[in-house]
Regions:
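ATP-binding N-terminal substructure of ATP-dependent carboxylate-amine bond-forming enzymes
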Residues: 1-107
Length: 109
């Protein structure tokens, strides 16, 4: 039976909690973080360290996962677009673009 691998952009507290919850559901996780000492490193099945704009690291991450989410809104929009062209990103990158600007976010809501 196919079990998708969940990619998580960001390895802070929320990324760690997401990896812990996924493990309880027998879902493998890979965390991509721009911090080598990210706490998510200790809760995921695999870990990719690199700048969120490093295309080689982005490709390494994409190769390891089936579907991607992110733990916070400060992932560069362009990075999410690049990833979304290869693998599905949820929430969609256009939502991230809205929440990166609090005035746009208020208008959207």
């Amino acid at each position: 039976m196919f079990k998708p691998v969940l990619g998580i952009l960001g390895g802070g507290q929320l990324g760690s909690l997401l990896a812990i919850a996924a493990k309880k559901l027998d879902i493998r996780t890979v965390i991509f973080s721009d911090s080598e000492i990210s706490p998510g490193k200790y809760f995921s099945d695999d870990f990719v360290f690199g700048d969120y704009t490093n295309i080689n690291k982005i490709k390494e991450f994409i190769y390891k996962v089936d579907v991607i989410t992110y733990e916070f809104e400060n992932i560069p929009y362009k990075t999410l677009e690049i990833i979304n062209n290869e693998k599905k990103v949820l929430p969609r990158p256009n939502i991230n673009k809205i929440v990166q600007n609090r005035l746009h976010e208020k208008d959207f809501i």
